[in-house]
Amino acid sequence: MKICWFKDSKIGHEKQVQAILDNLALTQDLVIEERDVSNPVWLELFLYFLRIKPKQDSIPDIIIGAGSATTIPMLRYKTDNKTKVISVMKPQFFESKFDLIVAPRHDYKEVPDNVFTYVGSIARVNINPDLENIGLIVVGGVNKHFDFNDGYLISQIDFVISLFPDINWIVFNSRRTPKGFNEKIKRNTSIRKFIDVHKNFEPLDDYLSKAKLKFVTPDSVNMIFESLSSSGETYLFDMHYSKENKITRLIDEVKSNKYAGFLEEKYLETSEIKTISLNKPNLLHGTFREVEKVVYEIERRFRK
């Protein structure tokens, strides 16, 4: 099977497509051509309306990509009706032109015939029966969905460490994490290792597959579902939001269904004193396998 993969250089997008192709390769012999998207969207639209097709050496069976920058280049590259164009995530333009769109369920109130939905985001399934005594703390940062409160998050981290004092705690930050928070984490002697994206970067994937416990801030949606797709227990920190939207509703769904455990702030009975409590996940849900559902749907629809 010949695959043409359009890439927009965004790690989160490319990891989702890579997970699909890795899973598809378990049952199909794949020949993958990668194409980087470089033109601005307006130029791609201009070329699309002029029906100017890019050069290609062979006709692919599937054209696939994720992210708005890949939408028009993928459609322009299709020259044969036998080629199927798949958008991973809801495209910015021309939804009806795609043979298949695989997108988060929260993006659609009504699902068209050419759309297949999944929960959250797509991630590689990683099953490890030999988990290590490691706890991960994965911190996002300033965002438009949740209030990033340094003090409240630090108090939750201290609470978690006090519950599991024998765990080796490793903290990962992100480019969005405030400097003040980073400085506070560096001073916490209960943390075994602080992996700062700016100074001593290490791949999170190396730890995600072997950590017994994983605590993630709810603004890091892709990371939540990467964690849920790996062995070990996933928990969400408590972050307040002022306005409900599809992301906050998704996080509420994850918590209400107990896909992940979560921290919660409550008042003591008949008191003005607030406490933090830990709610456990329902382990009967098992490891998330959304990528396998997506690949099954691709094979079902486009089986030769």
Identify the residue ranges that each predicted region occupies.
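Nucleotide-activated sugar donor-binding and catalytic core shared by glycosyltransferases
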Residues: 1-304
